[in-house]
Regions:
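Catalytic alpha/beta core domains of metabolic enzymes, predominantly
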Residues: 43-46, 50, 60-179
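Structural signal for hydrophobic packing residues in well-ordered secondary-structure cores
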Residues: 1, 29-32, 108-111, 115, ...
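C-terminal extensions of enzymes
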Residues: 176-219
């Protein structure tokens, strides 16, 4: 819903270089007039994003699992003439016992003192509560599976009020571990931030496995 563009993901593995990603991104950006090229929140992905925005290519930085990655995305894309999207993956953090909505909260808080060129796209939304909390925290965008949209519709399209309280719990009702806010300097070079995160690595590996599986099925 809405007019936020369509994200097209470049093929990457753990050995992909920024120049390879950029070459794919330049081609993909010509496919449709509202394209956003998806790069991962890795060192090479940030290099590709930095070069892309200099060429006025819109980008969506995916597989974000840390506030440091979000700070690096801001710094690497400073000066972009178009909104830059960053996609924190809520559900996958929940899966490992951490409160994924805290990451969205922390990124939004950090960006309060920014120039506003990076927009938060809440990703890996699993529940209506995830969706409502995304609204409450002010995420500009969200990727939502049809099941959650249907549940939200059936509930009458509720929206969070000022007293909305989100409690992060796992499937068994056990509280999720909070993710603490960090005071990070957005004026630092993007290379100074620690981009490493296990879930980003696993996300790339899963993408490669899914891609190869699709190729085998279509052969």
């Amino acid at each position: 819903m809405g007019d936020a563009g369509v994200s097209i993901e470049v093929f990457v593995d753990l050995d992909s270089r920024a120049e390879e990603m950029l070459a794919q991104g330049q081609e993909m950006f010509t496919w449709i007039p509202n394209a956003y090229v998806k790069y991962p929140c890795t060192h090479e992905g940030l290099r590709a994003a930095e070069m892309s925005v200099q060429k006025s290519i819109r980008v969506n930085m995916t597989l974000c699992f840390s506030q440091e990655q979000a700070a690096a995305v801001y710094a690497a894309t400073r000066g972009s003439k178009e909104p830059v999207y960053i996609s924190p993956f809520v559900g996958r953090l929940d899966d490992q016992g951490e409160d994924g909505m805290d990451l969205v909260r922390n990124i939004k808080k950090m960006y309060e003192r920014s120039d506003g060129h990076v927009h938060v796209l809440a990703a890996s939304i699993r529940t209506v509560n995830h969706l409502l909390c995304s609204f409450f925290l002010g995420a500009e965008l969200a990727t939502v599976p049809s099941k959650v949209l249907q549940e939200w519709t059936a509930a009458g399209f509720p929206m969070p009020d000022q007293d909305f309280l989100y409690k992060g719990v796992d499937a068994k009702g056990k509280p999720l571990k909070p993710i603490a806010y960090k005071n990070l300097d957005l004026n630092l070079p993007w290379e100074s931030f620690d981009l490493a995160h296990e879930l980003t690595t696993k996300g790339i590996q899963k993408f490669v496995a899914d891609y190869q599986s699709t190729l085998r099925r279509s052969a």
